[in-house]
């Protein structure tokens, strides 16, 4: 992939191995405490090293098909708080740059919504309307 993905917040890389990057937001380097962001299907080449302190917008790596079965190059992002996975949708919805995750009740069948734009999840597709690429403001 030519488009890398960047840190959505300041933190420190608690783990970087085997298609995974863990961004620790409280900076204690312990992914079992506080908020952490989990990125999966991260390419080995260009992946940020463990222990690096990052600022919002710093390059973390590149989407890939590494780390298991995949129908195409992509990235997963999830979050944990004190070691517990926090659902993307619901009362504590995951919001990234105004995009709000919504769950349909079926795995991989949710949407991202920002204002009037709704982007449905789509298994195995590469339609332009299902791609969100964020550019940091200058």
Where are the regions a protein language model picked out?
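Short, surface-exposed secondary-structure boundary micro-motifs
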Residues: 59, 64-65
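Short alpha-helical segments in extracytoplasmic peptidoglycan/chitin-binding modules
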Residues: 39, 54, 60
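Acidic, glycine-rich catalytic/binding loops that coordinate metals and/or anionic ligands
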Residues: 49-55, 73, 78-138
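Secretory pathway export signals and precursors
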Residues: 31, 61, 118-121
């Amino acid at each position: 992939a030519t488009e890398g993905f960047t840190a959505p917040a300041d933190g420190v890389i608690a783990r970087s191995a085997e298609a995974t990057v863990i961004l620790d937001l409280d900076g204690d380097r312990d992914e079992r405490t506080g908020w952490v962001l989990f990125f999966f299907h991260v390419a080995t080449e260009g992946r940020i090293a463990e222990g690096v302190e990052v600022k919002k917008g710093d390059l973390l790596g590149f989407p890939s098909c590494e780390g298991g079965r995949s129908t195409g190059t992509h990235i997963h992002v999830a979050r944990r708080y004190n070691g517990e996975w926090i659902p993307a949708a619901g009362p504590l919805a995951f919001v990234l740059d105004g995009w709000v995750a919504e769950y349909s009740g079926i795995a991989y069948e949710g949407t991202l919504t920002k204002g009037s734009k709704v982007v449905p999840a789509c298994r195995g597709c590469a339609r332009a309307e299902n791609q969100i690429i964020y550019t940091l403001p200058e």
